[in-house]
């Protein structure tokens, strides 16, 4: 049996990790994209060594890897645990000032001294958290539970395994940079992470077990115009901004993130930048089904061709499509033990597993593309990438319990 988890230690770890400014930079060409990620990587290296792990290394790309050999000769499996160092560039992660709400009583929570607040009127899940200890923001930054809650949970689980000498299988640990911008995982040293399967600890609500994700691509559409003084523009000016606005109208209005859920894909206009002479539109293309995904990419190509033919532009619009990641299910389905073990571990600690698709991606999607099954486990966090982000300390404790239970590798 696992003795009572020291919530104070778990909380202190988390609060320490979120003090590192590790926000990734979206247009970076090299990893890590921010200095703080390397600083956190070095801190974790130090702590992993103190915990007695072996082969603890930090690469020049800020990828942390470590190994803890099994302490029971009958437990021969090797399981990996993965979390990421960076926070989202969509909301400031600098000078995070967490606030701890003990025994949340329900109702609205004021964030800091400003006008920001979170309310169960908008976030119905808060009703489930009454009586729990919540860590929230001060309303000026994100919290960083994505994914520093996962890091704290992995480190706490390792600490308990070592202190209590709990029988466990071989364990590989990795902390990766720049997950939020899809960059750092490309520098992942697969040769130092050989395992039977792995788990990212990067999910949300307690019970979440995810092993299907979007196929993802990014499309960039460029428009070229011709500027001239507006007083003499008739018959001469070509406004790239106007062209871009017209092109945007060809997309299905209901196939967008704010109108879809479950396994329904979408197009998402993520960025619109430029001026009269040149504009670039950036679209996210997402779908769970591989055939539908291909059709979505073909749709954009066809619309670009039609637009060019219709307008007869001297300099036609340009299209660039880059695949980002693929649905991990094609790999995970061949390693059903990875799902069965997580299911069993959750049930063993009194948690009902909630199998759900990820409407996004994780480092596990990339690892799956390399042949390594890597489902995603909950962290106890909510409202990621926003000033309304929060995490439940009891939810984090649940994650630690599940990690330890999985690493016992019972009945495998």
Curated annotation (Swiss-Prot):
SUPFAM superfamilies: Bacterial exopeptidase dimerisation domain, Zn-dependent exopeptidases. Its EC number is 3.4.11.4. It is found in: Cytoplasm. InterPro entries: ArgE/DapE_CS, Bact_exopeptidase_dim_dom, Peptidase_M20, Peptidase_M20_dimer, Peptidase_M20B. It comes from the Bacteria. Zn(2+) 2 binds at residues 146, 180, 385. Zn(2+) 1 binds at residues 84, 146, 202. GO terms for cellular component: cytosol. GO terms for biological process: peptide catabolic process; proteolysis. Binds 2 Zn(2+) ions per subunit. It catalyses: Release of the N-terminal residue from a tripeptide. Pfam families: M20_dimer (PF07687), Peptidase_M20 (PF01546). The keyword Hydrolase applies. GO terms for molecular function: metallopeptidase activity; tripeptide aminopeptidase activity; zinc ion binding. PROSITE patterns: ARGE_DAPE_CPG2_1, ARGE_DAPE_CPG2_2. The active site is at residues 86, 179. CDD domains: M20_peptT. It is an enzyme of class 3 (hydrolase). Its cofactor is Zn(2+). Keywords: Aminopeptidase, Cytoplasm, Hydrolase, Metal-binding, Metalloprotease, Protease, Zinc. Belongs to the peptidase M20B family. Cleaves the N-terminal amino acid of tripeptides. This is Peptidase T. It comes from Haemophilus influenzae (strain PittGG).
């Amino acid at each position: 049996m696992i003795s009572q988890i020291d919530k104070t230690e778990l909380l202190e770890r988390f609060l320490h990790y979120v003090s590192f400014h590790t926000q990734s930079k979206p247009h970076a060409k090299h990893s890590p994209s921010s200095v703080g990620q390397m600083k956190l990587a070095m801190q974790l290296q130090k702590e992993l060594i103190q915990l007695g792990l072996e082969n603890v290394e930090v690469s020049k790309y800020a990828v942390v890897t470590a190994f803890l050999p099994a302490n029971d000769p009958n437990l021969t499996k090797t399981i990996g645990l993965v979390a990421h160092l960076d926070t989202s560039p969509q909301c400031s992660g600098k000078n995070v000032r967490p606030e701890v709400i003990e025994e949340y009583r329900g109702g609205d929570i004021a964030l800091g001294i400003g006008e920001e607040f979170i309310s169960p009127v908008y976030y119905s899940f808060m009703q489930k958290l009454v009586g729990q200890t919540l860590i929230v923001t001060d309303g000026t930054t994100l919290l960083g539970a994505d994914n520093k809650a996962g890091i704290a949970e992995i480190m706490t689980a390792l600490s308990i395994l070592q202190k209590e000498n709990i029988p466990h299988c071989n364990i590989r640990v990795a902390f990766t940079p720049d997950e939020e911008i899809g960059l750092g995982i490309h520098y992942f040293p697969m040769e130092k992470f050989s395992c039977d399967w792995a788990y990212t600890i990067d999910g949300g609500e307690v019970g979440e077990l995810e092993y299907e994700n979007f196929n993802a691509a990014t499309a960039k559409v460029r428009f070229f115009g011709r500027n001239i003084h507006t007083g003499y523009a008739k018959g001469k000016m070509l406004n790239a901004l106007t062209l871009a606005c017209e092109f945007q109208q060809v997309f299905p209005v209901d196939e967008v993130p704010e109108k879809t859920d479950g396994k329904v894909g979408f197009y998402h206009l993520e960025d619109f930048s430029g001026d009269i002479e040149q504009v670039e539109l950036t679209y996210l293309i997402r779908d769970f089904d591989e055939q539908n995904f291909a059709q979505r990419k073909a749709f954009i190509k066809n619309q670009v061709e039609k637009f060019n033919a219709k307008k007869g532009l001297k300099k036609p619009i340009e299209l660039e499509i880059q695949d980002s990641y693929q649905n991990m299910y094609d790999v995970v389905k061949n390693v059903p033990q990875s799902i069965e073990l997580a299911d069993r571990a959750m049930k063993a600690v009194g948690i009902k597993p909630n199998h759900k698709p990820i409407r996004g991606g994780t480092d596990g999607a990339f690892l799956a593309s390399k042949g390594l099954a890597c489902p995603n486990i909950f962290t106890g966090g909510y409202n990621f990438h926003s000033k309304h982000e929060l995490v439940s300390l009891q939810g984090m404790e649940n994650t630690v319990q599940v990690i330890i239970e999985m690493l016992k590798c019972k009945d495998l």
